[in-house]
């Protein structure tokens, strides 16, 4: 287990370094400036030692020499401040460029992920990786640049300056150093696994909170508050446990290294005092050595804290990099062509598909749709209606068989051009933040106001839009929170009305609309579907009576096929389903 964790940590670090290497210019400047800053800082104890010797040395106090030293110190302090400012600017540039790159790649990957990945992971957990985990990583990376590099340079620089004063004392310091390194290394291995668990649980908690907040009406309607709170408490307890363990191991790093570093300071003081008494060094040089001992041990204390932050940062980076490295949707074939304008002909031949290998869903599915035909798909929940739509849009690839559009197999078409030829209105509405005008024009950004208004009128959305205070300029809240479900659905229909592609998919498109509005929408749909191949998924059979073909599906297969009158005459599954829905009105 330890070996696996260590390998994961190293692998993540290598991947992070690949991002950092893109900005080698800033990195090189930062390292050089760190060396300059440390060199200037370490020169100060030399000057202080010289000043001490001019005060405690034989004869009168050398005030002139002291003033010269003070002027040098003032210049050095000023240069150090400037160098540190520029170094921090370089570090910030590296950190936030890397964060930008990682977030961009993560978002690009999300848009390329196959639907099966998005179906298997909650969107809250994915958002947590891109936002919270990247923020945690940024904090650790910035601290790593600002303190880790400077600390390392300070350690080696201090030893060099100490060697110029007393080789024996410098060697004594080097002998004690490995103890501090061993302590920090031992604890670092313990903290990484805990921070990884903490990060994963934080993502789980974020996903759960977003799920509950987004569906609070349903939670309250079913009196599910106690169960939700119990589940949240369980996740929260685990997060607390992992957080405490991570903090426990990280908290003992600093005291442990401080103890070892105190030994270093004491060693320099004792050995230096005896050396000064013996005449090996002056009092001023002893003062310089004690200052160096303090500066030498200080980075170990800081680095121990940095290591803790880096453990957390690497754990978080591992989660977002894991997302970036997920297999993307199977790319278009190299010889794939664009479907310029579909003629509406669709053929499915011996199509097989399953989400899970051992559970067959679509089996030996065959269908031939002529241009302009309206195809309705009905059946019980789980029969494969939405799955069939997913295959037509190539959100999923079939296991075997052939699907052709305009006599061209889907695999020979680019996904974008295929999907551009479909207009979709789904049961689940999605509106982006922005004005109503922007949402309607989503598929046609260059649409004129006249075109947008015409589309809204065709979908019967114009009336409620004009009643809003800002009309078409009304800004929609997140996911259309300030609109009713029916109003959101009307805007989604208007969006398709504006583009009017050659083929349409209506998946429970009127499920959230009242009966009165539904009649108007059906008339609008009838006009919209004229001359366009249309696939209509519906539970309410009143919406599909005018379809050219009605497919009755069960367990992934077509069990009945025909128009409304033909299926009623067969007195089969469709007839029973239809009669059950209209029993009260008959």
Predicted features, each with a name:
Residues 1-41, 56-73, 87-91, 95, ...:
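Membrane-integrated ABC transporters
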Residues 2-6, 96, 104-128, 132-134, ...:
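Short intracellular "coupling" helices and adjacent cytoplasmic loop segments at the cytosolic face
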Residues 17, 25-46, 69, 73, ...:
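Alpha-helical segments in transporter systems
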Residues 17, 115-116, 132-141, 145, ...:
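An intracellular "coupling" helix at the cytosolic face of ABC transporter transmembrane type-1 domains
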Residues 22, 26-39, 43, 50, ...:
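Transmembrane helices of ABC transporter permease
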Residues 75-79, 178, 209, 259, ...:
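Hydrophobic transmembrane alpha-helices
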Residues 224, 248, 265, 295-323:
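Cytosolic ends of transmembrane helices, especially the final helix of ABC transmembrane type-1 domains
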Residues 332-333, 339-586:
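ABC-type nucleotide-binding domain
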């Amino acid at each position: 287990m330890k070996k696996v964790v260590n390998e994961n940590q190293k692998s993540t670090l290598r991947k992070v370094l690949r991002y950092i290497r893109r900005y080698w210019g800033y990195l090189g400047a930062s390292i050089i400036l760190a060396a300059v800053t440390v060199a200037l800082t370490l020169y100060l104890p030399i000057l202080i030692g010289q000043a001490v010797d001019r005060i405690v040395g034989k004869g009168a106090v050398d005030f002139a020499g002291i003033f010269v030293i003070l002027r040098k110190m003032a210049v050095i302090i000023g240069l150090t401040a400037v160098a540190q400012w520029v170094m921090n600017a370089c570090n910030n540039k590296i950190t936030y460029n890397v964060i930008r790159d990682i977030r961009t790649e993560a978002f690009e990957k999300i848009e390329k992920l196959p639907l099966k990945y998005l179906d298997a992971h909650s969107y809250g957990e994915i958002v947590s990786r891109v936002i919270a985990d990247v923020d945690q990583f940024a904090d650790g990376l910035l601290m790593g640049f600002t303190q880790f590099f400077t600390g390392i340079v300070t350690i080696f620089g201090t030893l060099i300056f100490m060697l110029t004063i007393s080789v024996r004392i410098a060697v004594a310091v080097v002998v004690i150093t490995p103890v501090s390194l061993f302590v920090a290394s031992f604890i670092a291995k313990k903290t990484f696994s805990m921070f990884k668990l903490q990060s994963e649980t934080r993502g789980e908690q974020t996903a759960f909170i977003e799920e509950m907040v987004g569906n609070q009406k349903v939670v309250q309607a079913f009196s599910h508050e106690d169960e939700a709170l119990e589940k949240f408490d369980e996740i929260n307890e685990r997060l607390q446990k992992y957080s405490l363990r991570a903090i426990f191991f990280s908290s003992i790093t600093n005291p442990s290294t401080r103890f070892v570093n105190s030994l270093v300071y004491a060693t320099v003081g004792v050995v230096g005092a005896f050396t000064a008494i013996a005449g090996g060094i002056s009092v001023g040089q002893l003062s310089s050595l004690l200052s160096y001992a303090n500066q030498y041990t200080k980075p170990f204390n800081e680095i121990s804290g940095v290591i803790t932050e880096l453990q957390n940062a690497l754990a978080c980076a591992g989660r977002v990099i894991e997302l970036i490295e997920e297999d993307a949707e199977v790319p278009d074939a190299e010889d794939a062509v664009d479907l310029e304008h579909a003629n509406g002909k669709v053929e499915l031949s011996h199509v097989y598909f399953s989400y899970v290998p051992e559970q067959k869903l679509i089996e030996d599915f065959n269908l031939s749709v002529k241009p302009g035909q309206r195809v309705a798909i009905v059946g019980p929940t789980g029969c494969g209606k939405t799955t069939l739509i997913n295959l037509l849009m190539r959100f999923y690839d079939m296991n075997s068989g052939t699907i052709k559009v305009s006599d061209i197999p889907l695999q020979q078409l680019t996904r974008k051009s295929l999907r551009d030829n479909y207009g979709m209105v789904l049961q689940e509405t999605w509106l982006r933040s922005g004005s109503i005008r922007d949402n309607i024009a989503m598929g046609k950004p260059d649409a004129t106001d006249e075109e947008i208004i015409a589309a809204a009128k065709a979908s019967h959305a114009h009336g409620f839009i004009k009643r809003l205070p800002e009309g078409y300029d009304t800004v929609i809240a997140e996911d259309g929170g300030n609109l009713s479900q029916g109003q959101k659905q009307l805007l989604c229909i208007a969006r398709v009305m504006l583009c009017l592609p050659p083929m349409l998919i209506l998946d429970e498109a009127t499920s959230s609309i009242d009966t009165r509005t539904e009649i108007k929408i059906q008339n609008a749909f009838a006009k919209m579907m004229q001359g366009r191949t249309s696939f209509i998924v519906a539970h309410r059979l009143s919406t599909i009576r005018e379809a050219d073909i009605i497919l009755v599906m069960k367990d992934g297969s077509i069990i009945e096929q025909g128009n409304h009158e033909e299926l009623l005459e067969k007195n089969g599954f469709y007839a029973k389903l239809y009669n059950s829905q209209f029993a009260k009105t008959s």
